[in-house]
Amino acid sequence: TKCYKTGDRIISEACPPGQDLCYMKTWCDVFCGTRGRVIELGCTATCPTVKPHEQITCCSTDNCNPHPKMKQ
């Protein structure tokens, strides 16, 4: 599976063996009012457990986790 990953910039990379799901996790930090929600993209073996005030979306096809600003 290939997923978008966050870092210095958003890139699409092949996931490590055993990590066949892509995810997008969003949450608010102290800058949420001015910058919006923090967005983390990556690969995972299982969909992470949602903690309070987080939103997590998991999917299983190549590059199915684009940053919201990348969507057409």
Curated annotation (Swiss-Prot):
Listed GO MF terms: acetylcholine receptor inhibitor activity; ion channel regulator activity; toxin activity
Disulphide bond pairs: 3-22, 15-43, 28-32, 47-58, 59-64
Subcellular location as annotated: Secreted
InterPro entries xrefs: Snake_3FTx, Snake_toxin-like_sf, Snake_toxin_con_site, Toxin_cobra-type
A GO term from the CC aspect: extracellular region
Summary of the tissues where the protein is detected: Expressed by the venom gland.
Gene3D superfamilies: CD59 (2.10.60.10)
PROSITE patterns noted in UniProt: SNAKE_TOXIN
UniProt xrefs under Pfam families: Toxin_cobra-type (PF21947)
Entry-linked CDD domains: TFP_snake_toxin
Assigned keywords, A-Z: Acetylcholine receptor inhibiting toxin, Disulfide bond, Ion channel impairing toxin, Neurotoxin, Postsynaptic neurotoxin, Secreted, Toxin
Family label: Belongs to the three-finger toxin family. Long-chain subfamily. Type II alpha-neurotoxin sub-subfamily.
Record's function text: Binds with high affinity to muscular (alpha-1/CHRNA1) and neuronal (alpha-7/CHRNA7) nicotinic acetylcholine receptor (nAChR) and inhibits acetylcholine from binding to the receptor, thereby impairing neuromuscular and neuronal transmission.
Protein name stated in the entry: Long neurotoxin 4
Organism: Ophiophagus hannah (King cobra)
